[in-house]
């Protein structure tokens, strides 16, 4: 038997084997796909959900930084901002992203010094507290701005493993700490 005929016979055997495998309709491929597909899709949807929450967190951070600039420069003081107006400004800065005003909590606090500040607890027993306030301070004051957004987790797997609150929501937090600028229409406090 020559080399050429041996190669030809080998090719023909492979073709016959491939044809037999392609005709096999016993369902092993579907079963194997089922074993692999379930973990694959769980992982895929989990990554998408975590990615969306991280994206929303970054949008919240940028929105808070932009809105906090109004406090730092005195524009919020001049326009008579309260908690609702500041919250509306944060939501406006998040426009184009599906957020709910009911899920956003704002806490703006004036503090005396960086060294003597003790943070207040905004989460107790797996839920947000109502200890939030709004005090944007005066020129030269140190201000802490916090925005807390209850991001809904869709899948039950993410609710049990990635959620911060008992409701199954992931708490997104954006914080800005700064000293107010000397507003042109007020005098700066001594030592400020």
PLM regions and their residue ranges:
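Alpha-helical assembly-interface signal, strongest on the long, hydrophobic N-terminal helix that forms
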Residues: 2-92
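Short, conserved structural patches
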Residues: 2-7, 69-192
């Amino acid at each position: 038997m020559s080399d050429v005929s041996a190669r030809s016979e080998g090719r023909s055997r492979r073709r016959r084997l491939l044809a037999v495998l392609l005709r096999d309709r016993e369902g092993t491929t579907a079963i194997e796909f089922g074993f692999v597909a379930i973990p694959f899709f769980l992982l895929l949807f989990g990554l998408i959900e975590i990615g969306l929450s991280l994206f929303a967190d970054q949008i919240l951070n940028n929105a808070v930084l932009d809105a906090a600039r109004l406090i730092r420069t005195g524009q919020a003081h001049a326009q008579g901002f309260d908690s609702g107006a500041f919250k509306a400004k944060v939501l406006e800065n998040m426009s184009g992203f599906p957020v709910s005003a009911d899920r956003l909590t704002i806490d703006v606090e004036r503090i005396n010094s960086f060294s003597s500040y003790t943070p207040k607890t905004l989460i107790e027993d797996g839920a947000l507290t109502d200890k939030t306030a709004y005090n944007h301070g005066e020129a030269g004051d140190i201000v802490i701005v916090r925005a807390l957004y209850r991001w809904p987790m869709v899948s039950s797997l993410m609710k049990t493993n990635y959620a911060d609150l008992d409701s199954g929501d992931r708490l997104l937090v954006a914080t800005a700490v700064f000293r107010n600028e000397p507003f042109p229409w007020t005098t700066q406090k001594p030592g400020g």
